[in-house]
From Swiss-Prot:
EC code: 5.4.2.10
Pfam families: PGM_PMM_I, PGM_PMM_II, PGM_PMM_III, PGM_PMM_IV
Function according to Swiss-Prot or TrEMBL: Catalyzes the conversion of glucosamine-6-phosphate to glucosamine-1-phosphate.
Molecular-function GO term, any one: magnesium ion binding
Highest taxon of source: Bacteria
InterPro entries, alphabetized: A-D-PHexomutase_a/b/a-I, A-D-PHexomutase_a/b/a-I/II/III, A-D-PHexomutase_a/b/a-II, A-D-PHexomutase_a/b/a-III, A-D-PHexomutase_C, A-D-PHexomutase_C_sf, A-D-PHexomutase_CS, Alpha-D-phosphohexomutase_SF
Source organism of the structure: Photorhabdus laumondii subsp. laumondii (strain DSM 15139 / CIP 105565 / TT01) (Photorhabdus luminescens subsp. laumondii)
Enzymatic reactions: alpha-D-glucosamine 1-phosphate = D-glucosamine 6-phosphate
Transmembrane segments annotated in the record for this chain: none
Listed name of the protein: Phosphoglucosamine mutase
Family indicated by similarity: Belongs to the phosphohexose mutase family.
Modified residues (Phosphoserine): S102
Active site per database record: S102
Amino acid sequence: MSNRKYFGTDGIRGKVGDSPITPDFVLKLGWAAGKVLARHGSRKIIIGKDTRISGYMLESSLEAGLAAAGLSASFTGPMPTPAVAYLTRTFRAEAGIVISASHNPYYDNGIKFFSIDGTKLPDDVEEAIEAEMEKPLTCVESAELGRANRIVDAAGRYIEFCKGTFPSEQSLNGLKIVLDCANGATYHIAPNVLRELGADVVTIGCEPNGININEKCGATDVRLLQQRVVEEKADVGLAFDGDGDRVIMVDHLGQKVDGDQILYIIAREALRQGQLRGGVVGTLMSNMGLELALKQLGIPFLRAKVGDRYVLEKLQEEGWRLGAENSGHVILLDKTTTGDGIVAGLQILSAMVRNHMSLHDLCSGMKLLPQVLVNVRFSGSHDPLKSENVINITKSVETELNGRGRVLLRKSGTEPLIRVMVEGEDDVQVTALAHRIADAVKHAG
């Protein structure tokens, strides 16, 4: 992928008030996107957002920029990212825009785009938008200005879509489910989906106030969910992130079930139902235990770079339909065009109903190897990964693992972080080794 000035692996993201997440930049971005997208014919753009307080400001800026370029905006209000992808397709809009920083704190926000078919914008379109950003802003003639409206039934449309991905001959009657919606975009969607399918639903993280999104809740912090599942004697728990494109689950014992385990269960079920096309795609961060478990089932497995867009690219290259990240992004191309936490969770619930098995038992065919991830924040222009000391210590750790584990160092695509991952057979050892490398990264440069 070429070096781009603004777009990262998941759109444009940053701290609100700091460049580039400022009202003037986002207005210019809306205008530039409008200029590029208007060339393709349709003049309607769907705009959704999560529950961050800054969403109001940024959607107004986007609307102004798009209108100046002659495009109209249709607002969904707070809506999961995959819902915007779905609505973009069903409304035949030229593009969808999501205002969200996903799992980040409330003071961050971001802008990401979907194309007319509900997939991430191609690199060349993002590059064209960046090129347009360098030009002076102009305004179309008054008669050609864009308009704005709200899609009043957006939530209901998406709820019905989600329910449609669950087998019609099944129901969730008799299942008690705890939902953690991260005080984010799924707060008014997921509880209704599961209740309408018959579940007894207990909710947490469903009271967004603009600043509590992802705060000690949701897919990135399931401790409260684990506690509530056990307290409520629930069958299962589901946690979504702030924009609803990922899911992490908790079994009836309070044990966390991550994206690798979710991918394993869905792949095994698809194989048993004769619905698995080819193999499945994970990432460089996927646990070795997933690879080994899939190998036992005879299911081909490939690793993509980290990022759901790269999982999707690999699936398209191979002509396969199923992929996931261990963070909980699950892509089911037979049902959706992008990661969808609610839809992925429904497939696991369906497997529980079909097999009359608990989530804990469904996971029993796969053993996760100990894996430790340490995030190290860095600043400045130096690249810690090029430090001679970091390189040497990483090599010594690989020697110590002696072929019975993995080491991965990579830059985050959305934050100024170096992610240090060490995987092996012994939990204590991999923890110590990961922190040894992290200390070297911290002091590099």
